[in-house]
Amino acid sequence: MKLLYVYETRVGTFFIGQSPDGRFHPVFDGESLGSYLSPQHATDDLAGGHTFSPAGGFDTATLGIPEDISEWDTVK
């Protein structure tokens, strides 16, 4: 999976990656939290707490993750 976007939170780093099939995945601690048609859909669901639960069981909606992909940094 190619990591494209990154956002730091108090619990760790989240990424938006793209798999070889062209789908986009919110990723935390190396684990995909879902599969989406666009990076914007991935960040919308991650910010709203509508993805698979990350290891640790915390609610991503409480972390201040922005819905707008333009507020994320690009992976260099």
Name every feature range the model reports, one short phrase each.
Residues 1-2:
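N-terminal leader/targeting segments and the first structural element of proteins
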Residues 6-32:
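Short aromatic-glycine-(Arg/Gly/Cys) micro-motifs in beta-strand/loop hairpins
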Residues 33-76:
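Mixed-charge, Lys/Arg-enriched low-complexity segments
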